[in-house]
């Protein structure tokens, strides 16, 4: 096992499967993470893009992720046995001070749109991407990454998930058991129609109770 994953520097092994492993990473992976997310979004939704546009988007995502990163940030990445990134997702506990993507893109503040009561915590889930050409089951990997991302929300007594979700992916999430609330109109962001949503801890449990076991987190 040590030999297989010797290339990993600041990543903690979470689970190993036949074709890939999932790691918990830290801020040192944000540059690689941002490039992966932007490239995969363009591959999936557009196909081709100018190099300058790609570079600008990667820089924007990197800057935003570094600004939002904190002690309660969890980054999960999947790598194949050669170390190539195959998938990613990130969740963080909002400190009520940093500007959320939800605010920046949609002008929506969770304290106004959901609850202002200080007892509620808001966890932002984002930066989900999967390499659809990897040959693995992307659907299974999605469920594994999402189960890991919502784990801290499920473990928090009064909590909400907030996110900006691709409209097609949102339909999949709802079919898998999420109960979501749309917070505003969709906007075209990073190559796809994106919907601002929230989900309470109870709304997450329909998914988590079924699929949390995929990574041994439930």
Region locations from a protein language model:
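C-terminal "cap" of GNAT-fold acetyltransferases
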Residues: 190-213
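Short amphipathic alpha-helix that is part of the acyltransferase structural core
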Residues: 7-64, 69-70, 75-79, 85
């Amino acid at each position: 096992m040590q030999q297989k994953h010797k290339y990993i520097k600041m990543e903690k092994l979470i689970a190993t499967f036949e074709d890939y492993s999932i790691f918990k990473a830290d801020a040192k992976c944000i540059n690689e993470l941002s490039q992966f997310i932007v490239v995969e979004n363009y591959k999936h939704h557009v196909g081709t893009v100018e190099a300058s546009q790609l570079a600008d988007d990667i820089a924007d995502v990197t800057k935003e992720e570094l600004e939002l990163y904190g002690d309660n940030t969890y980054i999960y990445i999947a790598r194949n046995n050669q170390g190539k990134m195959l998938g990613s997702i990130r969740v963080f506990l909002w400190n009520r001070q940093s500007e959320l993507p939800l605010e920046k893109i949609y002008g929506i503040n969770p304290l106004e749109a959901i609850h202002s009561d200080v007892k509620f915590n808001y966890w932002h889930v984002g930066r989900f991407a999967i390499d659809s050409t990897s040959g693995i089951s992307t659907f299974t990997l999605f469920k594994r990454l999402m189960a890991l991302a919502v784990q801290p929300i499920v473990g928090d007594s009064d909590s909400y998930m907030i996110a900006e979700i691709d409209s097609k992916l949102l339909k999949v999430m709802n079919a898998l058991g999420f109960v979501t609330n749309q917070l505003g109109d969709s906007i075209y962001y990073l190559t796809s129609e994106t919907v601002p949503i929230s989900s309470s801890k109870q709304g997450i449990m329909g998914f988590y109770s079924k699929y949390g076991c995929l990574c041994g987190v439930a």
